[in-house]
Amino acid sequence: MNDGFAMNTHSKDERAPENGQAENMAVENGAEAAQAADRATPVSEEDVLLRLAKENEDLKERALRLTAEMENLRKRTQRDVADARVYGIANFARDMLTVSDNLQRALQAVSEEARAQADSGLKALVEGVEMTERAMLATLERHGVKRVDPNGEKFDPHFHQAMFEVPNADVPNNTVVQVVQPGYVIGDRVLRPAMVGVAKGGPKAETPAATSEQAAQGPEGA
């Protein structure tokens, strides 16, 4: 009896691989049949042309995007190189302005009377300091650093720093009437704003009342 049970079990084990192979063959046959059906389906020339046209349009869009990205990268690189060339010495130039200020203070410490009465040694020293300052400023200017001396100009908060106000009836309001310390720029960037005194309330400045009256009169009233 045990022998019969073993034979039945063995028979089932032998049939299991056969069933799996049959299922695999069925799947493969189904896939081949589907592919054959696809090949058998006729594709019109119009469909082919439409598909090719769409692919061509997609390629054009990708090419345009790539061209635009490359152009933007080229412009950005050029701008970065130009900025590095112009502004690369900004920190160094700012530090050198302190040296120039000290030279100027040294010159201001020697009065005109003292210079007139000075011996040849002191005169030579003063002239040497003046030449050094001029050479330093000329070198900075060759590298794009420009001096801002706005005396008599309208106050501009982008380039000037107001230190005090001066009542002055002879000039328009917000006119720079005194430069305490000149400013410097490099390119369109401010290295140091000019420290200035600004006029307050001159009669040449148009009053709000007069402006309002002229606006109310219009062109005919003017």
Curated annotation (Swiss-Prot):
<keyword id="KW-0963">Cytoplasm</keyword>
<keyword id="KW-0346">Stress response</keyword>
<dbReference type="GO" id="GO:0005737">
    <property type="term" value="C:cytoplasm"/>
</dbReference>
<comment type="subunit">
    <text>Homodimer.</text>
</comment>
<dbReference type="GO" id="GO:0006457">
    <property type="term" value="P:protein folding"/>
</dbReference>
<feature type="region of interest" description="Disordered">
    <location>
        <begin position="200"/>
        <end position="222"/>
    </location>
</feature>
<comment type="function">
    <text>Participates actively in the response to hyperosmotic and heat shock by preventing the aggregation of stress-denatured proteins, in association with DnaK and GrpE. It is the nucleotide exchange factor for DnaK and may function as a thermosensor. Unfolded proteins bind initially to DnaJ; upon interaction with the DnaJ-bound protein, DnaK hydrolyzes its bound ATP, resulting in the formation of a stable complex. GrpE releases ADP from DnaK; ATP binding to DnaK triggers the release of the substrate protein, thus completing the reaction cycle.</text>
</comment>
<dbReference type="InterPro" id="IPR013805">
    <property type="entry name" value="GrpE_coiled_coil"/>
</dbReference>
<dbReference type="GO" id="GO:0051087">
    <property type="term" value="F:protein-folding chaperone binding"/>
</dbReference>
<keyword id="KW-0143">Chaperone</keyword>
<feature type="region of interest" description="Disordered">
    <location>
        <begin position="1"/>
        <end position="21"/>
    </location>
</feature>
<dbReference type="GO" id="GO:0042803">
    <property type="term" value="F:protein homodimerization activity"/>
</dbReference>
<protein>
    <recommendedName>
        <fullName>Protein GrpE</fullName>
    </recommendedName>
</protein>
<comment type="similarity">
    <text>Belongs to the GrpE family.</text>
</comment>
<dbReference type="InterPro" id="IPR000740">
    <property type="entry name" value="GrpE"/>
</dbReference>
<dbReference type="GO" id="GO:0000774">
    <property type="term" value="F:adenyl-nucleotide exchange factor activity"/>
</dbReference>
<dbReference type="GO" id="GO:0051082">
    <property type="term" value="F:unfolded protein binding"/>
</dbReference>
<dbReference type="Pfam" id="PF01025">
    <property type="entry name" value="GrpE"/>
</dbReference>
<dbReference type="InterPro" id="IPR009012">
    <property type="entry name" value="GrpE_head"/>
</dbReference>
